[in-house]
Design a protein with these regions (language model features):
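A short Gly-Trp-Pro
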Residues: 1-130
Length: 130
């Protein structure tokens, strides 16, 4: 199955083929700042499953990840690993924003103090253990 999405102004569009590898809510401080939100809800795909068209820009938010956003409207679309493996697609940027449901929380140790997690999903204090 192919799911499509894009930015607020329509200048950047993407297609995601297949099912995501995982769907997580990240509470890390970098995601909080990059998204301007208490957390980043994303569906993670292999980069080869994604096709992106339009005028997107990148910002190196850490040594491993670029944040991809629309140059025109500023919509934050992806957390893109520089090693060419994975990309986290912001869930709300899919045309069908209810296509995927998160199953886990990561970096709960960095969540904002007023955020409560009472959804019964798996929680990790940091990243997923290897």
């Amino acid at each position: 199955m192919i799911r499509e999405g894009g930015c607020l102004c329509g200048a950047v569009r993407f297609k995601a083929e297949g099912e995501p590898l995982n769907v997580r809510i990240c509470h890390c401080r970098i995601c909080q700042k990059a998204m301007g939100s208490p957390y980043f809800v994303r569906a993670q795909f292999d980069q080869r499953a994604l096709t992106v068209e339009g005028d997107a820009a990148r910002y190196a938010s850490s040594e491993n990840i670029d944040r991809v956003f629309c140059k025109r409207c500023g919509t934050r679309l992806f957390a893109w690993r520089r090693n060419g493996t994975l990309a986290g697609v912001a869930l709300a940027t899919f045309d069908d924003r209810n296509a995927f449901v998160p199953t886990e929380h990561i970096w709960v140790s960095e969540k904002m103090g007023w955020v409560t997690i009472e959804d019964g999903m798996i929680r990790y204090e940091g990243t997923i253990p290897t």
